[in-house]
Amino acid sequence: MADAADLRPAAANANFRSSRHAPQRFQTLHFRGTAMTQPTVVIKYGGHAMDKPELSEAFATDLAHLAGQGMRLVVVHGGGPQISALLTRLQIESRFVDGLRVTDEATMRAVEMVLCGQVNKAVVSAFARHGARAAGISGRDGGLLRARPKNPALGLVGEVTAVDPALPRCLLEAGFVPVVAPVASGPDGEALNINADTAAGALAGALAAEYFVLISDVPGVLNADGRLIPGLNRAEITRLKEDGVISGGMIPKVEACLNALDAGCSRALILDGRAQSSLRRYLLDDAPLGTVIVR
């Protein structure tokens, strides 16, 4: 398709900036109403920010406010706890390999039911209650996300190979907030389960978003002493992974940020979704929150 974005990594930028300068670099580009006209912001939404009622309501309020300020918002949501709950009721065992859910055909049916039905529509409804015009879609709609099986041991878990952003672009132009469930179409049209961080980063790159914000349950990337690192580049991320400081669930988050930057996104951030109005404070008030990822 003409609008499809190839996800093959671009050449790395050799001119790394020191992480201690990253927040200042990004603050000068923050949205100012007139300084940046209708910036596109792709948000990975999940964790406590989505599961805890008081945080989810606050997030919906902030999202509606940001949309009212002229930001073009795209939300990609997770739904792991809800999937596990349904599988338990169906007496299907939940198994994970390296943090990824092993997905056979029965599990995939449950995944698609929960993500595209239950969770997607609940998120859309929450946003609508607070005045945001949201439209729920999945990665299979309009050929948005295409993928191939990631690893035979994982079953129907996919890695994204291409993104066609035509559908979310149409929704954005019409004034809607696209809310995307991370399910993709495989080579034979089969449904594939996609890590939500990965899907969101791929979409941010394909849309050439000004911001990719990954909402997490931690303040950002932490150093070996448990203190927040305000900014990181690719070389520093590689070193911290080798040292075991970046591990587990943080690995796909930083990789999603780097992939988004490689594919055309301007800036990426891992942000604490447990902090009240963290997204709004970062985008509108230049609050020094989270970890900024640069190439």
What does each model-found stretch correspond to?
Residues 3, 8, 13, 17-20, ...:
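Nucleotide/pyrophosphate-binding catalytic subdomain
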